[in-house]
Design a protein with these regions (language model features):
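A glycine- and Lys/Arg-enriched "phosphate-lid" helix/loop adjacent to the NTP-binding pocket
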Residues: 120-182, 217
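Conserved lysine of the Walker
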Residues: 16
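Hydrophobic positions on the alpha1 helix immediately C-terminal to the Walker A/P-loop
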Residues: 19
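P-loop (Walker A) phosphate-binding loop of NTP-binding proteins
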Residues: 11
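Conserved nucleotide-sensing/catalytic segment adjacent to the nucleotide-binding pocket
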Residues: 62-124
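Conserved substrate/cofactor phosphate-moiety recognition/catalytic segment
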Residues: 24-83
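Phosphate-end processing signature that detects enzymes handling 5′-triphosphorylated RNA
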Residues: 208, 213-384
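NTP-dependent small-molecule kinase module
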Residues: 2, 172, 178-229
Length: 384
């Protein structure tokens, strides 16, 4: 059975509760079987399992951060409970549901605790003490939906709502919102949704995004630019407000048609690596990921040893939030690119500081870069 794991996150009053309720309303109790919470989508039967917010459960039942020895101790308990919940509920797949897919929706994920601790270093300590790695956590979710707080997008509308576990004031809520978003930067499929639109429109956007992901997989919805810059221009992005991940893409010969790229992906952060096998269709100047599977290191090595490497692309990805937008800057050997969500309408003033655009890139980014890399290597060889 296929499994999709989605973390639903965001700052206070971002619409998370309303979105989660709307997702639940998509499901029905299947009259043809004993199974409940079934979503019917494009001929597929999808078993929906939602995992409630751990912080609200703890606080509402008497375990509060203000009563703890310190915030770290509370977050450590929260992390442990959340980790156990995720591991246990995922065992439900073994129940043998009469469905094509199991969809897990987590009301907040394991990285959310970063927003409530004093520093990134403190969160790294918490992760280590719980026997995990940040990249391991980041890459265990297939999709991350970040609902920006109205404190960020529409401050005048922000107000405390009737959730007894919510106690953030507006300015603090804005700070928490930013730190929450920053905790998830570097995720392969992170999507930010603004709350300065009617709530129903925001809900519809999220629902459609989830449906598209289930139906079509990862869609290339990034605006891409070749930029002139220097790594030193990004000195303001540190471990506290960004994430830098080393990415190696090996293009393999698996005997598939020429319009399909089979890629072995290795992502490395703080000396820990995760691995993926991805199949990308390149037709009509469009790239669509039609297969994306997380694999272990042994499988990665086996596929690498048994198949021919056609090409290889290595880059350093710097991901960060600025002006409430998600940016990714990729540093290659001889050039640099900037990416952001095509749904974002950005002015020049909203682009990262010191970024100078050379040209817009269309179509497959990696294909463009591989070709450009070959040209640059040829030019270098002619100079020798």
């Amino acid at each position: 059975m296929d499994i999709i794991k989605i973390a639903l996150t965001g700052g206070p009053a971002g619409g998370k509760t309303s979105v989660l309720n709307a997702i639940k309303e998509l499901s029905v109790n299947d009259v043809d079987s004993k199974y409940k919470n079934i979503i019917h989508l494009n001929g597929k039967k999808i078993k929906l399992i939602t995992v409630p917010e751990t912080a609200t459960e703890l606080i509402s039942n008497g375990i509060t951060p203000v009563e703890a020895n310190n915030v770290y101790d509370f977050q450590n308990i929260l992390f442990g409970v959340q980790k156990s919940k995720e591991e246990l509920v995922e065992q439900a797949v073994s129940f043998g549901y009469d469905a094509d897919m199991c969809l897990f929706i987590y009301d907040r994920g394991l990285l959310d605790g970063r927003a409530y601790l004093n520093s990134k270093e403190e969160f790294e300590r918490l992760v280590t003490e719980n026997g995990m790695e940040e990249l391991e956590i980041l890459d265990q979710y297939d999709l991350v939906i970040d609902l920006l707080s109205t404190a960020t997008c529409l401050p005048q509308k922000y107000s405390l709502e009737n959730n007894k576990a919510r106690f953030e004031e507006a300015e603090w809520a804005k700070s928490i919102d930013y730190l929450t978003s920053t905790a998830w930067v570097g995720h392969r499929n992170l999507k930010l949704f603004r709350s300065d639109i009617p709530l129903q429109k925001e809900i519809d956007q999220v629902i459609n995004h989830i449906k598209d992901y289930i139906t079509y997989g990862i869609k290339d919805n990034q605006e891409k630019y070749l930029i002139e810059t220097d790594p030193d221009d990004f000195y303001q992005y540190t471990n506290e407000n960004s994430r830098t991940i080393q990415v190696n893409n090996k293009y393999m010969n698996f005997g598939l048609p020429s319009y399909l790229d089979t890629i072995l992906i290795k992502r490395t952060y703080r000396d820990y690596s995760t691995y993926f096998l991805q199949v990308v269709s390149n037709r009509s100047n469009k790239s669509v990921v039609i297969g994306d599977q997380k694999i272990d290191e042994a499988t990665y090595s086996e596929l690498l040893n048994k198949n021919e490497v056609i090409d290889e692309v290595t880059k350093t990805e710097l991901s960060f939030i600025e002006n409430n937008h998600l940016f990714k800057v990729s540093f290659y050997e001889d050039f640099t690119t900037l990416e952001f969500d095509r749904d974002d309408v950005l002015s020049l003033e909203e682009l990262p500081k010191d970024v100078r655009i050379i040209e817009k890139l269309d179509g497959s980014l990696d294909k463009f870069l591989k070709n450009k890399e070959k040209v640059l290597k040829k030019e270098k060889s002619m100079l020798i």
